[in-house]
């Protein structure tokens, strides 16, 4: 399993609309992507315009090729992209340790 972390900064004052949009994008677009396992959206406390999106994929290629190079990515960005203050910083991780 691969964890995608996207550090997202949105336009000020758009939190409620962004949260609705990202929930809609995940539930209508991301769920149709091959290898998509689920997601979590985390809202910044100290910085209310910051979100950390966690998406779980079967493989790295399911995200970087299967999703990013498909029409689904265009749909996704049309829903969430208008809220971005800057392009998200995206990185991928593999699990090294899990507590009980």
Region annotations inferred by a language model:
Residues 3-8:
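Active-site-flanking beta-strand signature of metal-NTP-handling nucleotidyl enzymes
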Residues 16, 61-63, 98-100:
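Residue-level signal for secondary-structure boundary sites
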Residues 9-21:
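Short, surface-exposed ligand-recognition loops at beta-strand->loop->(often short) alpha-helix junctions
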Residues 24, 28-36, 56-89:
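An amphipathic, aromatic/His-enriched active-site/gating alpha helix that lines ligand/cofactor pockets
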Residues 12-14, 45-47, 59-61:
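Feature marks short, surface-exposed loop/turn motifs that line or immediately flank catalytic pockets
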Residues 2, 40-49, 75-100:
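Glycine-rich beta-strand-turn "strand-cap" elements at beta-sheet edges
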Residues 9, 42, 54-56:
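Short hydrophobic/aromatic beta-strand micro-patches
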């Amino acid at each position: 399993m691969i964890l995608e972390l996207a550090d997202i900064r949105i336009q000020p004052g758009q939190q409620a609309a962004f949260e609705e949009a990202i929930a809609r994008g995940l539930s209508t677009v991301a769920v149709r992507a091959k290898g998509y396992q689920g997601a979590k959206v985390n809202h910044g406390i100290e910085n209310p315009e910051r979100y950390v999106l966690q998406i779980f994929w079967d493989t790295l290629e399911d995200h970087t090729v299967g999703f990013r190079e498909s029409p689904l990515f265009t749909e996704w960005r049309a829903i969430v992209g208008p809220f971005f203050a800057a392009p998200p910083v995206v990185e991928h991780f593999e699990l090294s340790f899990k507590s009980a």
